[in-house]
Amino acid sequence: MHILFLFIFHCLAFKDLIFFKQYVPFAAAGGYPISFLFIKVLTASTNLLLSSSSGGSWNKLSKESQLLKVILTHFLVPIFFFLFQYIILSEDRQQERQPKFRDNAKFDGHAKTCHI
């Protein structure tokens, strides 16, 4: 089940990189998009938080902590990832929809006047 969640998550993330035309600015470290770094930071901080509270070993974690770790890494992190991507892409779409202001006189080649 664990491998299935990872496979689905990585397929969705790969599809996200391939099919979206607007890319998140690439970070300097490793060429990862910022959203992937965001996921890595969330996952690493979750792992660090849960493993440090139990002495640094997965086997020493209680069943509740193991369940919490699985929920955080496989459900909440992808949700944060897609929300993060949605916010960035919606901002890009808003910028595309904004009308570009032009001077009608210069654009049409003559000034539009109102005759009374």
From Swiss-Prot:
Keywords: Membrane, Transmembrane, Transmembrane helix. GO terms for cellular component: membrane. The chain crosses the membrane at residues 24-44, 70-90. It is found in: Membrane. It is a multi-pass membrane protein. Partially overlaps REG2. This is Putative uncharacterized protein YBR051W.
